[in-house]
Design a protein with these regions (language model features):
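Short acidic, glycine-rich surface-loop motifs adjacent to enzyme active sites
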Residues: 164-184
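Short active-site segment of divalent metal-dependent hydrolases/proteases
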Residues: 30, 68-69, 101, 180, ...
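Histidine-centered catalytic micro-motifs
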Residues: 173-180, 212-222
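Active-site glycine-centered loops adjacent to acidic/histidine catalytic or metal-binding residues
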Residues: 27, 65-66, 98-99, 177, ...
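N-terminal active-site segment of His-dependent metallophosphoesterases
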Residues: 14-77
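Structural motif
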Residues: 22-24, 62, 132-134, 173-175, ...
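Sec-dependent N-terminal signal peptides
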Residues: 3-12
């Protein structure tokens, strides 16, 4: 403990900010294992993830979508919220909507239901020298049934990114459910990405405002790609994995030199995670 305090004091004395970390969970998706007949395995996985977060005590936990499997399912939502409430009150929890939370084609009704159960579907938050932008990627990618809501979110994002340019606000980091793309920014449309025409518009906006990191989920496996200076990281699931992946979560370290990250399977989580 004494050594840690000396290192921290030295870093502050030299004008450097100490490193810190947060945890990214994704796709706990209560109901997926048993196709909405139950969620015993999801309960076990999420209980373990929350207990581990309490042990590691990160700056915050963000859950990048698909909290539940069936949009509007009261039992799945209640179980997610019951376990999430076990997180240490000193650790902020940020929910992000996924397509299984608001529907593949969100409507005003599904958006209202999500907001009632889980809170706002897009918003910003601050953590040390980071400015988090939570986006509703389902609404971005499929706006047809809620066009006014989609337009409102897009206008809001532009305004908030402009505010974030002010000195002292912190580096912008985006959290959403769908990755913008899997391999290349101009790839063809598919289930796992954002439609190309919409994607191009938003990528231009993120580049315009100097965003360097987007953390997503949706794929139930780990994927990483980039568009110039913009890194797109899709994180594997707390819930059911696909494609040979394993359940786990990502540790993201934020320091003076930038951002680094590592995905840990549940069986490989170290006893402690000092800032790197």
């Amino acid at each position: 403990m004494r050594l840690f305090l000396l290192v921290l004091w030295a870093a502050l004395a030299c004008g450097a900010s100490p490193s810190w970390y947060f945890l990214q969970f994704s796709d706990p998706q209560f109901g997926m294992y048993e196709e909405n007949r139950g969620f015993v395995q999801e309960t076990a996985n999420f209980e373990y993830a929350i207990a581990t977060a309490n042990r590691l005590h990160p700056a915050f936990v963000v859950v990048t979508g698909d909290l539940i499997n069936q949009p509007g399912d009261a039992a799945e939502a209640a179980e997610y919220r019951r376990i999430a409430a076990k997180l240490d009150p000193g650790i902020p929890l940020y929910n992000v909507p996924g397509n299984h939370d608001v529907g593949n084609d969100p409507t005003p009704a599904t958006l209202a239901a999500y907001r009632q159960r889980f809170g706002p579907d897009y918003y910003t938050f601050r953590a040390a020298d980071l400015m988090g932008f939570v986006l509703n990627s389902s609404l971005i990618g499929h706006p047809a049934k809620a066009p006014e809501e989609a337009a409102r979110q897009e206008a809001w994002l532009g305004a908030e990114l402009e505010k974030a340019r002010r000195p002292g606000i912190g580096r912008p980091v985006v959290f959403q459910h769908h990755p913008w793309f899997l391999k290349a920014p101009d790839e063809a449309d598919e289930y796992s990405n954002i439609p190309k025409e919409i994607r191009a518009r938003y990528l231009a906006l993120l580049h315009q405002y100097g965003v360097r990191w987007v953390f997503a989920g949706h794929c139930h496996r780990n994927e990483q790609s980039s568009d110039g200076t913009l890194e797109i990281v899709a994180t594997g699931p707390v819930g059911k994995p696909l494609g040979g992946a394993r359940s786990g979560f990502r540790v993201v370290t934020v320091g003076p030199e930038g951002i680094s990250h590592h995905y840990y399977d549940f069986g490989d989580i170290p006893n402690r995670l000092p800032p790197q």
